[in-house]
Amino acid sequence: MKKILFFLMCFIVLHISACASADKPITKENLPQAAQTFIQTYFSDKTITLVKQDTDVARKTYDVVFADGTEVEFNGKGLWTEVSTKTGAVPQDLVPETIRTFISGKYAGQTICRIERERAKTEVKLSNGLELTFNKDGRLIDIDN
């Protein structure tokens, strides 16, 4: 009886692990409306090569990859959480004004090639490789090479 219970528990754990995270390709039309609007506003000139939905146990996220290597990640509501570019810069309108001002003053000539926003902080990666972390008020709190 103990062996049967043990194998049953192992099966359940493996099954939950296998189902816990699943990436699946979807169409742009299956994105939340906010994500569709974001893409139309900032990336209408780019060709989408892949749209995928990642479903974890507790949340859904979406990834959109463009032909030029630009990637955008969205949360389950369709709000962007990360934008990264292989060539060029992140659209300036996505960068909070305080962060733009700081970067143009301290790192003139550098472009932002990645921006990631979280609840209490925003991280940006510059074209020179520096990664800057700002608090929610736009104050620099960390620099990583």
Predicted regions and their residues:
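Interaction-mediating elements
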Residues: 23-145
